[in-house]
Amino acid sequence: MEIFVISCDGYLWERAYTSLNDAKKELQSRGFVIDFNSLDTNHYIRTIKYKDITYTNYAKIKSVYL
């Protein structure tokens, strides 16, 4: 069985997804967009700006077989 997990800034999210589309929808609902600087379409990026501080999160969807 194949499941999909999200790794964000080096940490795995606690939840796993049964479809790639569900994992993508979860990231998009949290403000992530596809990172077009990467050749892999499963790389996502989110930039948060607050006052003078800009913070960037990087996420990747990984496939795991059970």
Model-derived features with residue positions:
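A short, exposed loop/beta-hairpin motif centered on an aromatic-Gly-Thr core
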Residues: 10-21
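Short, mixed-charge low-complexity intrinsically disordered segments
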Residues: 30-66
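Short aromatic-glycine-(Arg/Gly/Cys) micro-motifs in beta-strand/loop hairpins
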Residues: 1-12, 45
